[in-house]
C-alpha cells in the first residue's frame, strides 16, 4: 500500500485484526468473509496459521476469480502444499507456495511496517512448471516490495527451517520456561542483561502459532532436537567433570559457526 503497488487492498481475519488494520489505514476494506475478500482479487495472499490452511484453501477455491494468483506465507511448506493440492482443485495451477523471511516476535496490525520486507528473503517453492512461470510473475511484485526472492524445494525448505527456525524457537521457549520455573525468575527478569534478552527474544512470540509450526514439521524438528541433546550432553558432561578443555572445545565449535552468521 505504501509503495502504491495495488489499487485496492482488502483483508479478512476471523477476529478483529482486519478491522483494526483498516482503522490504521493498512487496508482499504475489511471483508466479512474469505469469499468477500477474494471477490475480484488479482492476488490472494494467505497468512493464516498452518492448521487452518486446508479450510481456507477450500474457501478460496470456491470464491477466487479464474485468473487470481494465490500464494501463502506459511512457515512450513510440504503439508501446506499437500493441503492446497487437495483443496484448491483446478486453482492449484495458479498457486505459488511462499514464505517471507521477515517479521519479529510481535504480531498483529500493530507490528506492521512499510519496510518489513526490505532486503529480506522471500522464498517461493513452486512444484511444477506452471507454478514456476507464475513464480516469476509474483517475484516481480515481491521485488518491488524490496524483498530478495529465491526459489527452493519444499522438502529442503522444511529441513532447513527446522534447523534454524522451528527447533530454535522450541528451544528458546523451553529455556524461558525453565527460567520462569526457577526460584529467581522475577530477579532474572529484573536484572538480566542484553545477553539473556537477545537469547530469549523469540520466546516472546505467539506460543500457539509456534506450537502449530513445530508440530507440523515435527519429524525434521525431532532430528534437530536429537542432535542438540548430543551437544548438550557434551556440555553437561564436561561441566560435571570440570573438564575445561572439553568445554572450550564445544564452545569454540559453536562460536566459529556463530561468527559466520554475522
Regions found by a protein language model. Give the residues of each.
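NAD(P)-binding Rossmann-fold cofactor-contacting core
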Residues: 5-26
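Conserved acidic residues
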Residues: 28, 42, 168
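Rossmann-like NAD(P)-binding element
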Residues: 34-69
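Glycine-rich, N-terminal phosphate-binding loop of Rossmann-like dinucleotide-binding domains
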Residues: 47-49, 74, 126
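Rossmann-like NAD(P)(H) cofactor-binding subdomain of soluble oxidoreductases
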Residues: 56-110
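Internal alpha-helical scaffold of NAD(P)-dependent oxidoreductase catalytic cores
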Residues: 116-201
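Interdomain hinge/lid region at the active-site interface
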Residues: 185-254
Amino acid at each position: 500500500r505504501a509503495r502504491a503497488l495495488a489499487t485496492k487492498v482488502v483483508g479478512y481475519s476471523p477476529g478483529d485484526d482486519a478491522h483494526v488494520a483498516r482503522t490504521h489505514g493498512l487496508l482499504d476494506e475489511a471483508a466479512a468473509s474469505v469469499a468477500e475478500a477474494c471477490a475480484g482479487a488479482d492476488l490472494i495472499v494467505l497468512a493464516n496459521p498452518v492448521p487452518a490452511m486446508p479450510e481456507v484453501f477450500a474457501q478460496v477455491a470456491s470464491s477466487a476469480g479464474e485468473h487470481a494468483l494465490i500464494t501463502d506465507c506459511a512457515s512450513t511448506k510440504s503439508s501446506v502444499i499437500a493441503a492446497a493440492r487437495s483443496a484448491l482443485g483446478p486453482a492449484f495451477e495458479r498457486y505459488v507456495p511462499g514464505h517471507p523471511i521477515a517479521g519479529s516476535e510481535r504480531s498483529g496490525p500493530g507490528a506492521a511496517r512499510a519496510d518489513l520486507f526490505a532486503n529480506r528473503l522471500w522464498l517461493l517453492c513452486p512444484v511444477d512448471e506452471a507454478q514456476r512461470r507464475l513464480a516469476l510473475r509474483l517475484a516481480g511484485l515481491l521485488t518491488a516490495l524490496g524483498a530478495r526472492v529465491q526459489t527452493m524445494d519444499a522438502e529442503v525448505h522444511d529441513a532447513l527451517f527446522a534447523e534454524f527456525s522451528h527447533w530454535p524457537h522450541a528451544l528458546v521457549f523451553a529455556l524461558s520456561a525453565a527460567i520462569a520455573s526457577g526460584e529467581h525468575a522475577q530477579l532474572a527478569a529484573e536484572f538480566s542483561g542484553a545477553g539473556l534478552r537477545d537469547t530469549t527474544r523469540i520466546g516472546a512470540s505467539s506460543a500457539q502459532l509456534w506450537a502449530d509450526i513445530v508440530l507440523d514439521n515435527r519429524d525434521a524438528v525431532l532430528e534437530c532436537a536429537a542432535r542438540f541433546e548430543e551437544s548438550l550432553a557434551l556440555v553437561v558432561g564436561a561441566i560435571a567433570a570440570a573438564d575445561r578443555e572439553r568445554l572450550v572445545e564445544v564452545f569454540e565449535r559453536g562460536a566459529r559457526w556463530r561468527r559466520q552468521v554475522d
